């Protein structure tokens, strides 16, 4: 369910020259691994379910937190209640725990979005990750496990684009969208086709101004 990244190639715009990071020159281990998110989440959930010292309360959400010097009480949307000595807020960029604690954030928008999709291609990717720095932002081609696994015929794309153009691009039909992808992707992997839905995520900087409060930490 994973694909190793053996080499990384970085290029600037249309230049035919590239910077090559070769795993054989750094000890032989992969530079990293690509794991599709749903596989990673399932593995985490199964490990939590098997742990003797963890109680999984899901699906559920925290409706309200009450903190004092003695501990924390969490009221759940299901009506249940949990009490602990410490609450760890690991609930993402729109953290309810952080908001409830009144912890402010510093934010900066890059006026860019990341368009993400999976493509199937004709040729083997050889477990090489490519990153191209284009005027609108980076365009990354990341190797995924093939279908069948040894085929090396699937990659994840992360296409950085200006926010002003993102709605138009996401509104294209599949044929027109792939035509735009090919302009940036090239033809070194042969013919390409979409292998799943497209997603778009805003790109921004955000960090909490404090990481600790009474009986609370952010992770």
Feature map (PLM): residue ranges:
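C-terminal catalytic lobe of FAD-dependent flavoproteins
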Residues: 215-219
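A short, aromatic/hydrophobic, helix- or strand-capping loop or linear motif
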Residues: 1-3, 193
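Conserved N-terminal helical subregion
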Residues: 3-100, 108-113
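Conserved FAD-binding catalytic core of PHBH/FMO-like flavoproteins
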Residues: 71-73, 86-203, 207-212
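A short, N-terminal amphipathic alpha-helix
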Residues: 1, 45-49, 124, 183-184
